[in-house]
Amino acid sequence: MIKLENIERRYASDEVETTALVDVNLEVAEGEFLAIMGPSGCGKSTLLNTLGTIDRPTSGHYWFGDQDLAAMDEKALAKFRAAQLGFVFQSFNLIDELTIEENTALGLAYRKDVSGNKAERVAAAMDTVGIAHRARHFPHQLSGGQQQRAAIARAIVGQPKLILADEPTGNLDTANGEQVMDILTALNAGGATIVMVTHSPSHADMAKRRIDMLDGRIVASAMRAI
């Protein structure tokens, strides 16, 4: 499904050039749940942003099926993101002035190919994450765990081919973090492909495969023991 070939990402300023990703080669199979770990500044978020086409590689190829995303222009990438990707952020990134139902519907805002009733799709996404009873509430009326579940509903409502989660439990207490991980695990069991950045070894162990990064490189890869 996904193949990164010799990906490099360099940032240049007037005084120094920083290399965030160094010769990264990675494959992610359809239906996989991959966890990315490593110390702060190792390139985890840059790798996730590259997978999300938010950050463009300086060199290398990013194959998504038969498409080389590294060669696409910004307009084509924006269309690709809207159709194929779902994002879950550590800070939730919900819009305060919108209800949870309206926030969830934002996952369809830039989709022109959505079949069926959009309201039903939104309701189904909220039900999947156990937040339907909060549909008419605003983000500030929800706990952190509920807000993250709403953010996951927004990510999955468009039925993306790939879900990218950046520290999805980072702002949550243990109980809410476990609930979010249970949701992600259930989504993966249902066929969703997920790539997650985390600092939690126990949460990484819930993924099917884990890679470790250091200084912009993938230094280890291991499948979960069954």
Give, region by region, the residue ranges found by the protein language model.
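ABC family nucleotide-binding domain
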Residues: 1-213
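H-loop (His-switch) and adjacent beta-strand-loop-beta switch element
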Residues: 210-222
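ABC ATPase nucleotide-binding domains
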Residues: 225-226
